[in-house]
Amino acid sequence: PYIAAYAEAGADIITAHYEATHHPHRTVQAIRAAGCKAGIALNPSTPAESVEYLLDSVDLICVMTVNPGFGGQSFIWSQLQKIEKLKSMIGSRPIYLEIDGGVDTETAASVVKAGANVLVAGSAVFKGGSVDEPLVYGENISAIRNTFKN
């Protein structure tokens, strides 16, 4: 029921956690049937090879670089090897490689170098800002971008 609800709400891409379903391929098929692009997310303990059979079916792979649950966690550096492995497995396929968790000015350049092309930054964007100080958010985003542009 969630896939249809997200699609009806206007989602373009729906990403499901690999570990949240017994049949990831069926979930990907259901997302596509709803008219959306399909993504699959991997928790830190899930090996890259787990999604090899899905590579011709997904538009996005999200590597969780923290354990899901709450914001502000520290980046798990061992996930760089998983990012590199997935980039190699993806090859020339048009699949986004997204990183979610602990993305900040200390980690952004490393994940981009490893092969990521979509970065999800939460706490690093919103630190120090407020409704009264919204310009801080833009400054934080620029600081993250500048780490891998140089």
What are these regions (language model features)?
Residues 22, 26, 104, 149-150:
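Expand to "…catalyze enediolate/carbanion chemistry for C-C bond making/breaking, isomerization
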Residues 141-149:
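C-terminal alpha-helix/helix-terminus motif
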Residues 6, 61, 86, 100, ...:
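Conserved, mostly hydrophobic/aromatic
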Residues 80-83, 108, 141:
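Short amphipathic alpha-helical surface patches that serve as generic macromolecular interface elements
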Residues 90, 129, 148:
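Active-site catalytic pocket residues across diverse enzymes, especially alpha/beta-hydrolases
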Residues 102-114:
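Acidic, divalent-metal-coordinating active-site segment for phosphoryl/phosphodiester hydrolysis
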Residues 14-22, 62-74, 114-141:
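Glycine-rich phosphate-binding active-site loops on the catalytic face of alpha/beta enzymes
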Residues 1-5, 9-96:
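Conserved anion-binding
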